[in-house]
């Protein structure tokens, strides 16, 4: 039987060095980040961006609705909304009836709507369209995302951008590193596996550059868990199998409210993260378009308009 030593494991992992580095992100040790999270937290009032990705192709016309436009009603006679059904923003536009909380934010002056955001010659493929939105490259596919390139350009701190969920979206992957991926709840790795990861990430003066890169990714995984562990407290229980709350596509089996609650707890604790990414799937609606979309938008509305949110934050929903 062959023995899998640390060195042989890192050499084998080197064939996927970019993926491993992206998964772990960052080039700093967990001790440094733990000290920063307690001794130098994010200053109160700092601007924080929360990006909400809606997977599946949300129907924008039935989200921000041109309820007075005859062309809108003519094009979709079976599932258009009338003036008395929408949350009217002005004399022409209204929000989907499921978006009661956001309508309240609009009235309070805390919600802005930007319409018509896109790119020339839209691609009608769900997959290519989402790739374009996440990479901001409409002309040709690239391997880095918008937030990933920001991380590349501004430093290598693995908790400056955090994705809630174990699946890191292309948005958060750069050429040199990536955002950290944080699962709901505390670090749930078995003790023996956690110890193995710590050992893999330990420095060794004989490592090659490629092995250092891979080892760093394992070290960074422990960094994220150690930095956030005091904030997370008790683990968040995943929803039951019959929970009607929609699940996040890149957010694992968690619903959007759980993801937002976790972000809010981190923000209130002063964790030094300025960009969070969360997600909600299930927007590829066909049959029962209105009912299905209303369920999804209600989940978004409840999470984004929750009164538990800190006063200083920005939420961006990709529709």
Regions found by a protein language model. Give the residues of each.
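Acidic/histidine-rich, metal-coordinating catalytic segments
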Residues: 316-319
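Feature for exported/extracytoplasmic and membrane-associated proteins, marking the mature portion
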Residues: 1-302, 306-312
């Amino acid at each position: 039987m062959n023995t899998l030593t640390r060195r042989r494991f890192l050499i084998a992992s080197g064939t996927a060095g970019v993926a491993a580095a992206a998964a772990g992100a960052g080039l700093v040790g967990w001790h440094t980040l733990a000290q920063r999270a307690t001794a130098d937290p994010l200053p109160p009032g700092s601007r924080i961006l929360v990006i909400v990705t809606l997977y599946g192709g949300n129907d924008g016309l039935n989200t921000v609705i041109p309820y007075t436009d005859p062309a809108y009603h003519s094009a979709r006679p079976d599932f258009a909304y009338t003036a008395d059904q929408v949350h009217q923003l002005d004399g022409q536009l209204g929000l989907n009836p499921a978006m009661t909380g956001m309508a309240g934010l609009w009235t309070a002056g805390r919600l802005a709507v930007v319409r018509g955001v896109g790119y020339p010659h839209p691609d009608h493929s769900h997959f290519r369209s989402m790739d374009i939105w996440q990479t901001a490259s409409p002309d040709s596919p690239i391997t880095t995302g918008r937030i990933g390139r920001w991380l590349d350009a501004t430093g290598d701190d693995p908790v400056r951008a955090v994705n809630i969920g174990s699946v890191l979206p292309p948005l958060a992957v750069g050429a040199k590193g990536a955002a950290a991926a944080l699962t709901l709840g505390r670090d749930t790795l078995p003790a023996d596996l956690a110890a193995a990861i710590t050992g893999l990430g330990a420095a060794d003066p004989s490592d090659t550059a490629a092995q250092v890169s891979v080892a760093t990714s394992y070290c960074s995984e422990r960094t994220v868990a150690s930095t956030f562990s005091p904030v997370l407290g008790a683990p968040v229980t995943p929803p039951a199998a019959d929970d009607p709350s929609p699940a996040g596509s890149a957010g694992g089996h968690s619903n959007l409210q759980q993801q937002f609650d976790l972000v809010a707890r981190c923000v209130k604790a002063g964790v030094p993260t300025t960009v969070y990414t969360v997600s909600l799937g299930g927007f590829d609606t066909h049959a029962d378009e209105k009912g299905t979309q209303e369920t999804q938008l209600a989940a978004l509305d409840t999470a984004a308009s929750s009164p538990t949110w800190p006063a200083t934050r920005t939420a961006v929903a990709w529709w």
